[in-house]
Amino acid sequence: MKFLLIACLAVPAILAQQTSAPGGNLCTYPPQGDESNQKAVPIQDFRTSGLDFVRPNWCITHCADRKSVKAAVRFQFANQSTAVPTYKVRRTFTRYSGMKVHAELISGNPTKRDDDPFNFCMDDAVSAQIDTIVNTYNDIETMSEALNFYINKPGWAYIIYDMGVPPSIIETDNVKHDMNYCEKSSNKQMPDGTYMTYQVFAGLIKAN
């Protein structure tokens, strides 16, 4: 999955593009056409876990400072019906407005979760476990490993972002309402009353 890297050397709140990943990782597998692509910039840090070795179906590009990342992932969706909605989702995180979400329906019949229309994690147990992990642990490395350990779904891989100090943007395409797919944000309240925001992108990865 060969693609352009975003904003390696600066932290503007735009999805600027560059052609290399200096000191980081540049994924060069050719695209297959059914990927879910997620771009996040600028962020504080990210970690992965689960079946997360870089390969054609789990392709992660990032800069050396890990402040920007692009994931191109081929998920094994549980429901192959064309009626299942597909969205393009843009999350904008600002200091004054918090997280704003715009979800554009690309195809299928629109559906949403009753509790949160912008939570694209259809498995209630997975969604709840993510919130528990974010609120239990204090470092992103431990959070990433806890996602794999506690959710415990064979074949799944996880990427979690510490969004850090706003502003930042996350864009995701080919977002599905599917039990084998999860894309959501989670907030953690700190002792001083402020909040930290984390973003999780996860699911069952295609075997080939």
UniProtKB/Swiss-Prot annotation:
A Pfam family it matches: DUF5352
Signal peptide positions (record): 1-16
UniProt-annotated glycosylation sites, renumbered to this chain: 79
Database matches in InterPro entries: DUF5352
Superkingdom assignment: Eukaryota
Keyword Glycoprotein: yes
Keywords, in A-Z order: Glycoprotein, Signal
The protein's name in its UniProt record: Uncharacterized protein ZK1320.3
Organism: Caenorhabditis elegans
Phylogenetic placement of the source organism: Eukaryota, Metazoa, Ecdysozoa, Nematoda, Chromadorea
